[in-house]
């Protein structure tokens, strides 16, 4: 259970790291690629948290 929440936190941390790195990039293509990676990490965090919520719902039944 804690591993699930930890993985969500790690994905969000990585997304923020990508945003910070992207902000320092002069090349627009590189910056956009890093921002896309950040979006993907956020998406993975959302998916993981939804799976966690579903697991908790089924355990409660």
Where are these regions (language model features)?
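Long, non-catalytic architectural segments outside compact domain cores
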Residues: 1-61
């Amino acid at each position: 259970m804690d591993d699930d929440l930890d993985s969500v936190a790690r994905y969000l941390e990585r997304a923020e790291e990508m945003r910070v790195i992207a902000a320092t990039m002069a090349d627009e293509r590189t910056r956009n690629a890093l921002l896309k990676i950040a979006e993907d990490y956020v998406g993975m965090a959302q998916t993981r948290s939804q799976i966690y919520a579903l697991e908790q719902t089924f355990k409660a039944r």
